[in-house]
Regions:
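Short, small-residue-biased leader/transition segments that mark boundaries at the very start
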Residues: 1-8
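Short, surface-exposed loop/turn segments at secondary-structure boundaries that line and modulate
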Residues: 12, 16-25, 47-66, 157-180, ...
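Glycine-rich and small/hydrophobic secondary-structure elements
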Residues: 31-34, 63-86, 181-206, 241
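Glycine-rich, mobile lid/loop segments that gate access to catalytic sites or pores
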Residues: 32-33, 37-153, 158, 163
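Flexible, glycine/charged-enriched surface loops at secondary-structure junctions
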Residues: 44-48, 79-83, 97, 153-165, ...
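Acidic, glycine-rich loop-and-beta core segments that form the ion-binding/anion-interacting portion
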Residues: 137-202
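A glycine- and small/hydrophobic-rich beta-loop-beta segment
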Residues: 174-248
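Internal helix-turn-beta structural module
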Residues: 232, 239, 243-338
Length: 338
């Protein structure tokens, strides 16, 4: 909503179950009311509170229930309770923590996320909140987030459907005694590696927990002319419904892989592509390779499937993550309430 994101935040209040999207003027008023209730409870200025909602589109917020919930807020609650409270169709929580030494102090970074269906950023029914205690300016933190989100959350897809609601938020309270992390310094790149670790882990957790999913798919594209092209092709492959159903059926159908790479909106020489499923080559310079069926069947039966394409066009690479497409995905979304 307007006015909820124009200053830096100190706290975030989240509700799940109702997206508060397409709810008109009343929905906007309800968002500001949530902000006010949280600010009063936490005894901070209202503009320092961020608001996020996830759930069914078009339903009004049950404000009486929410107001009662705010009366039970605690400042030092259990992080696991928060991770559970923000879920919708997710089957499990998604959290990650990492520590790194900067000078004479240790910086801690922690992340929590939700997301299972309507996942195809940029825009997805996903939320991710990352907190740390590093001494870093808001501007530098924003730049790090912008860089890392491109190769993590923006590289996942569950079903190709975007959504009305998503948010990735990084906050730092600056409580450690490390020297301020400056952009382009050695500490900045170390900090970005921490952020990359957290956000990659959370992104893969969302992909792994895709609605009805039984397998995580990781696609790596190497030998591209540009990193953006590699990422585009990787996401095209992992987002293909035919690739996803082949993975669900444990069928090493490389034809679907090369086809989905080919319709990515970038150019490459289709006659120079290598494809590996797991460690097994199935296509070399765009010619099929005989492989041991029992060996590849063992790979296809695993819960994590890796697919690698080498374009032999350059030195850049990119990755994307998704999941298989099962009968349960149809069941879940056929029965999901409106």
């Amino acid at each position: 909503s307007r006015g909820l994101g124009d200053v830096y935040k100190r706290q975030i209040v989240v509700n799940s179950g109702i997206a508060n999207s397409c709810t008109g003027i009343q929905g906007e008023k309800d968002a500001f009311k949530m902000q006010q209730l949280a600010a009063n409870k936490l005894q901070i200025q209202q503009e320092y509170v961020g608001v996020a909602s996830t759930g069914v589109i078009g339903k009004m917020m049950p404000m009486s229930i929410l107001e009662n919930g705010f009366s039970k807020l605690v400042k030092n609650g259990n992080a696991d309770d928060f991770a559970k409270a923000i879920l919708t169709t997710d089957t499990h929580t998604k959290t990650c923590v990492v520590n790194e030494v900067f000078g004479n102090d240790t910086v801690t970074m922690a992340g929590v996320a939700k997301g299972s269906g309507m996942i195809h950023p940029n825009l997805a029914t996903m939320l991710a909140f990352i907190t740390c205690d590093a001494n870093i300016s808001s501007q530098t933190l924003q730049q790090a987030l912008k860089d890392v989100v491109e190769v993590t959350f923006n590289q996942i897809t569950v079903d190709g459907d975007t959504s009305t609601n998503d948010m990735v938020l990084v906050m730092s309270n600056g409580c450690t005694n490390n020297n301020e992390i400056k952009k382009d310094s050695e500490d900045y790149y170390k900090f970005k590696q921490m952020l990359l670790y957290i956000m990659t882990d959370l992104a893969k957790s969302i992909a792994r927990d895709g609605e009805g999913a039984s397998k995580l798919i990781e696609v790596t594209v190497k030998g591209a002319k540009e990193s953006s092209a590699a990422r585009m092709i990787a996401k095209s492959v992992v987002g293909s419904s035919l690739v996803k159903t082949a993975i669900f059926g444990e069928d090493p159908n490389w034809g679907r892989i090369i086809a989905s790479a080919g319709y990515a909106k970038t150019n490459f020489d289709i006659n120079q592509v290598d494809i590996f499923i797991g460690r097994i080559p199935v296509l070399i310079r765009s010619s099929p390779i005989k492989y041991d069926k029992e060996e590849i069947q063992e790979i296809m039966s695993a819960e994590e499937i890796s697919i690698e394409l080498d374009l032999h066009q350059g030195n850049y690479e990119g990755q994307a993550w998704g999941c298989d497409l099962s009968y349960d995905y149809v069941k879940i979304n056929a029965l999901y309430t409106t």
